[in-house]
């Protein structure tokens, strides 16, 4: 059964998502956090929901405030601001989105919660979970596991795509535009994968101390934010994913760096960052993992 669910966040923003219910009543749910330029209507979401519903677990996919390319952030008092979508979002605000989704699912009777992120959604989950843990969030124990699909090293990938000289040039340009009060203006079209505002660009590549924790090319990094996750942890990539290094090498590195005794890590062959044509394979691997939690 599919149900549309609206929910209000701590900062009064209203979001909406799709709750896929299994045939029998359950107290267990996967909350899915999408990545850049995405939404809860993806084919992948429908396939994962079907597979996970078959395991007797509900699946809640919602549009976070970074949904699609550009959108208004609407509040329950009727006001709206053009500061949403991948163009304008501040990834740190995902804390409110994720916390709000957790509390809505608890309100609906789901006491066993699994947080699942894709791409930037992984970044959002790791950041939000660490913040909730730091704040001694009263419902932290209801979070049973974390599922990270296609976690990306945001900074290193950008340097790889642009080259270090152009990377530095674009960062300097963003800082100059900020100094002129042009935070909401767009960066040059060749600075990023899609249109992006100055303020969002600076969040990813300058003001990123709280989200730059997937440092795959830094052999000395201790991955403390990921190691702060003590509950079961599932990580997957597609064989042709958005990573600079070879996946076999990356996975071996992370096996040595991540100290989680219930770590399930690997990649899926013959697919990409979005798991095209392998969504059901991914779903079955997630389902198998959830049975061990």
Predicted regions and their residues:
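Short, surface-exposed "cap/lid" segments of acyl-processing enzymes
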Residues: 23-76
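Catalytic histidine-centered segment of alpha/beta-hydrolase-like enzymes
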Residues: 271-281
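Alpha/beta-hydrolase active-site loop
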Residues: 82-107
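Short glycine-rich catalytic loops that host catalytic nucleophiles or stabilize transition states
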Residues: 264-272
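Short beta-strand/loop motif that positions the catalytic acidic residue
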Residues: 229, 235-237
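Conserved alpha/beta-hydrolase "acid-adjacent" motif
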Residues: 242-249
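Primarily recognizes the serine-hydrolase "nucleophile elbow" in alpha/beta-hydrolase
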Residues: 103-175, 206
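N-terminal cap/lid segment of alpha/beta-hydrolase-fold proteins
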Residues: 1-24
């Amino acid at each position: 059964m599919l149900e549309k669910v609206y929910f209000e966040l701590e900062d009064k923003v209203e979001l909406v998502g799709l709750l896929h219910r299994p045939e029998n009543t359950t107290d267990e749910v996967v909350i899915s956090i999408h990545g850049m330029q995405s939404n809860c209507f993806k084919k992948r979401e429908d396939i994962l929901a079907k597979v996970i519903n078959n395991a007797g677990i509900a699946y809640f996919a919602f549009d976070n405030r970074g949904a699609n390319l550009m959108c208004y952030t609407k509040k329950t008092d009727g006001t709206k601001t053009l500061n949403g979508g991948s163009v304008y979002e501040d990834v740190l605000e995902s804390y409110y989105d994720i916390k709000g989704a957790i509390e809505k699912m608890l309100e609906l009777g789901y006491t066993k919660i699994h947080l699942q992120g894709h791409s930037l959604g992984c970044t959002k989950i790791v950041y939000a979970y660490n913040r909730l843990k730091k704040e001694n969030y009263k419902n932290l124990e209801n979070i049973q596991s974390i599922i990270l699909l296609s976690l990306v090293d945001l900074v290193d990938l950008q340097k790889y795509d642009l080259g270090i000289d152009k990377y530095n040039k674009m960062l300097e340009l963003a800082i100059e535009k900020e100094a002129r009060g042009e935070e909401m203006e767009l960066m040059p079209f060749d600075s990023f994968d899609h249109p992006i505002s100055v303020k969002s660009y600076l969040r990813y590549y300058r003001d990123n101390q709280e989200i730059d924790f997937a440092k795959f090319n830094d052999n000395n990094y201790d991955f403390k934010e990921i190691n702060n996750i003590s509950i079961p942890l599932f990580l997957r990539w597609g064989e042709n994913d958005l990573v600079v290094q070879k996946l076999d090498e990356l996975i071996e590195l992370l096996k040595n760096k991540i100290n989680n005794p219930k770590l399930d890590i690997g990649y899926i062959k013959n697919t990409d960052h979005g798991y095209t044509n392998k969504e059901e394979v991914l779903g079955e691997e997630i389902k198998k993992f959830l049975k061990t939690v």
